């Protein structure tokens, strides 16, 4: 079977959806041909990677994908986005590129991601192929860039065109209870493909410090660190707290951070560097989202390490709890708890008593089997072969 992956966010950095797909490619390519179609704004073609996780990449390059940046006034660019004009240009470019690519590579099946949206829309309009949508972001996330009416109208058409949709249990429930007509039989419910062989930690002598790590993207709205920062203000000199990821280097500019702990802020790093930082930390920090059914995939990356971590959740039905309540070395702290002092005491006691502990690997692989790349890839291949 010839499989085409239509994914964005491969250049200049790899986005979350592309990172998730990267876990599956080795399993998809074990017995099948896999190629990638992706797009980027105006750039030097010589700098574009020729392959992604071993799969050859066909690039769609055009500066029109950055239409809104041509305007002096940001408000005009935002208005263009809200009515889908930027998406429309990207769709046109991708559709033309896919049609031309098909003459060179006669693909039988197409797997696309929902973000960026033109990837899924392009796949939905390719005739005579099996179509599978990899839907790991809830529809509400798209609403941040476009109007609700445009999102619902476009999303309904894209979902209807798919043969199967791979998604999380939370998004599946949200879709089935929404006004978008979709059958349960079309859905393949899995976790994030993050339970894989973990990176071993760097060997070092124990100096008595407790190293905490937040790794990920800091948002001021949907993933605000404010509650954790309130606890951070109560930590002493034993702790080293590292924030690593997008926007983390601006932490002290955006928030009032006061602590006796050693504080380190690091901008977004290559994925392998982030994984090594997780392996070398003592306790990790997970901050849940305020958007319903939107779960940080980092939650399962933390679980995969086998190390202790603290999960801050903003909603009683936060999807992180589905996984963290089963994890023996996780402290779940609700951000609705007004008693910061008591929460800080629980936090400190958890860190001190669990430093150096790990969860049995066999337990993780058994309890989170639906989050392994091999399991998910097999589900996808079964669906594409029907």
Regions found by a protein language model. Give the residues of each.
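N-terminal subdomain of nucleotide-sugar transferases
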Residues: 1-60, 233-236
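Conserved donor-binding/catalytic core segment of Leloir-type glycosyltransferases
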Residues: 4, 205-222, 229
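Membrane-proximal helix-turn-helix segments that form the acceptor-binding/catalytic region
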Residues: 24, 118, 148-167
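An aromatic- and histidine-rich active-site surface loop
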Residues: 44, 87-95, 110-128
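Nucleotide-sugar donor phosphate/pyrophosphate-binding loop at the beta->alpha transition
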Residues: 139-158, 196, 221-222
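A short, active-site helix/loop in glycosyltransferases that binds the activated sugar's phosphate group
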Residues: 160-187
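Nucleotide-activated donor-binding/catalytic signature segment of Leloir-type glycosyltransferases, i.e.
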Residues: 245, 251-273
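Catalytic binding pocket for nucleotide-activated donors in carbohydrate/polymer assembly enzymes
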Residues: 279-370
């Amino acid at each position: 079977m010839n499989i085409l992956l239509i994914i964005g966010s491969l250049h200049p950095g790899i986005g979350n959806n592309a990172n998730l797909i990267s876990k599956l490619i080795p399993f998809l390519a074990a017995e099948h041909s896999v190629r990638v179609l992706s797009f980027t704004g105006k750039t030097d073609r010589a700098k574009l990677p020729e392959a992604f996780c071993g799969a050859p990449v066909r690039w769609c390059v055009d500066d029109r994908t950055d239409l809104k940046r041509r305007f002096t006034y940001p408000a005009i660019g935002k208005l263009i986005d809200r009515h889908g004009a930027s998406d429309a240009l990207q769709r046109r470019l991708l559709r033309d590129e896919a049609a031309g690519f098909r003459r060179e590579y006669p693909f039988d099946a197409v797997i696309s991601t929902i973000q960026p949206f033109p990837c899924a829309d392009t796949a939905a309009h390719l005739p005579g192929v099996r179509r599978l949508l990899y839907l790991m972001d809830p529809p509400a996330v798209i609403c941040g860039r476009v109007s609700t009416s445009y999102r619902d109208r476009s999303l309904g058409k894209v979902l209807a065109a798919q043969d199967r949709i791979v998604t999380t249990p939370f998004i599946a429930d949200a879709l089935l209870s929404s006004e978008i007509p979709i059958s349960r039989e079309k859905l393949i419910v899995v976790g994030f493909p993050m339970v894989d062989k973990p990176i071993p930690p760097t060997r070092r002598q124990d100096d008595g410090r407790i190293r905490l790590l937040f790794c990920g993207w800091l948002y001021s709205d949907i993933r605000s660190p404010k509650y954790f920062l309130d606890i951070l203000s109560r930590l002493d000199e034993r702790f080293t707290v590292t924030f690593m990821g997008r926007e983390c280097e601006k932490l002290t500019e955006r928030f009032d951070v006061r602590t006796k702990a050693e504080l380190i802020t690091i901008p977004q790093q290559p994925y392998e560097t982030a994984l090594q930082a997780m392996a070398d930390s003592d306790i990790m920090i997970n901050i849940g989202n305020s958007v319903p059914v939107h779960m940080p995939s980092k939650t399962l990356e933390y679980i995969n390490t086998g190390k202790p971590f603290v999960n801050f959740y903003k909603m009683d039905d936060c999807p992180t709890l589905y996984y963290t309540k089963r994890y023996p070395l996780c402290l779940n702290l609700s951000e609705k708890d007004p008693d910061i002092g008591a929460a800080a005491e629980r936090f400190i006691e958890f860190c001190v008593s669990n430093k150096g502990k790990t969860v049995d690997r066999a337990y993780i692989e058994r309890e989170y089997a639906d989050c392994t790349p091999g399991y998910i890839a097999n589900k996808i291949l079964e669906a594409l072969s029907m």
